[in-house]
Amino acid sequence: MIKKTTYSHPLVHRLMDTEAQKEDREDDDDKTVVEEIMARCFFPALLTTTSWEGFHFVGHEIRITEAMDCYGAVVWPSALVLCYFLETNVKQYNMVDKNVIEIGAGTGLVSIVASLLGAHVTATDLPELLGNLQYNISRNTKMKCKHLPQVKELSWGIALDKNFPRSSNNFDYILAADVVYAHPFLEELLITFDHLCKDTTIILWVMKFRLEKENKFIDRFKELFDLEEISSFPSLHIKLYKALRKNRRSA
């Protein structure tokens, strides 16, 4: 299970423990989990007419076709972290029969894993990515999932009321992996999070830190949402967050 590292040693041991020792233990924990996550990837033993990369999640072999010339059609480590988290935390974050939307779905790996875990999934991305996204989702979920996943266009901040009216947004979870980087649409991304999120919606968001711009987005995000760091992977410069709308009404 991925969880934020905590230690419950006796007080005397904790007082004797140096910061260096703590950092060494945290580095070991990070290395162990990252190795386990990356072990879920495999490549075809033989060359085929269609290039694909393989992953093992939820007891299934998932084959993903990527487009190396397109940033949004590549499986990035953040997606693997989120898939691993969903698979290993099914008791706390049960996907069965939940309404789930993934923004910036890219190749569709996270949406596929959520579908295999029993969720009603809507996978979204830019129009130019939908063909490959639909292909990957169809080939990996057909006859395998409780609910057939949907693929929809979602350009952040554009025609949200028309395509995703607030009255019909009843998402239990919003999933996002590596949607924050050096692109000019961070404000539109924040608007999209806000539009899709109800008081009871849980956002599970994995982020790779690259530039100061990402830290500024975090500050803006925290104006609207209560943000909790669940896990950190220093070797990957990745953090996993859970977020809920601020000032939400009790259910």
What are these regions (language model features)?
Residues M1-A251:
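S-adenosylmethionine-dependent methyltransferases
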